[in-house]
Amino acid sequence: MNSLSIFFIVVATAAVCLLFIQGYSIYENYGNIKEFNATHAAFEYSKSIGGTPALDRRVQDVNDTISDVKQKWRCVTYPGNGFVSASVFGFQAEVGPNNTRSIRKFNTMQQCIDFTFSDVINIDIYNPCVAPNINNAECQFLKSVL
């Protein structure tokens, strides 16, 4: 064995030892790690002190770049007609003939989630709270879920 191979053996042994030490440290503190994660889970998607939003980068969705809670899209139960996707901007819309817009309704919560948080950018929005219909039932419902 020459000195170069001995050097690489020492470096590899040190690296393996560090991995074992890290693994043992996680094993010893696993209860504390779970407690910390449970305590701070509510802040997972909140805005950080630095001003940049804390994002879940595993899945891209429409709420990733929004830090205001009212602007985030959510699926809510619509009275008597299934589920709708809503935010402060309005509802996800269906565009009908003559460019008329109506609320897009879904039969199940899963259909609403799949449509709202899909990779497709859904830009059709219907806001019932713009003049002259400020006091209609759809606007009151939108305000109640925000």
UniProtKB/Swiss-Prot annotation:
Keyword Membrane among record annotations: yes
Regions annotated as coiled coil: none
Membrane topology: Single-pass type III membrane protein
Main localisation: virion
Signal sequence interval, chain numbering: none
Subcellular location: Virion membrane
Subunit organization: Part of a stable entry-fusion complex (EFC) which is at least composed of proteins OPG143, OPG147, OPG155, OPG086, OPG094, OPG107, OPG104, and OPG099. Formation of the viral membrane is necessary for the assembly of the complex. Interacts directly with protein OPG107.
Protein task: Envelope protein required for virus entry into host cell and for cell-cell fusion (syncytium formation).
Name of this chain's protein: Envelope protein OPG155
Protein's organism: Cowpox virus (strain Brighton Red) (CPV)
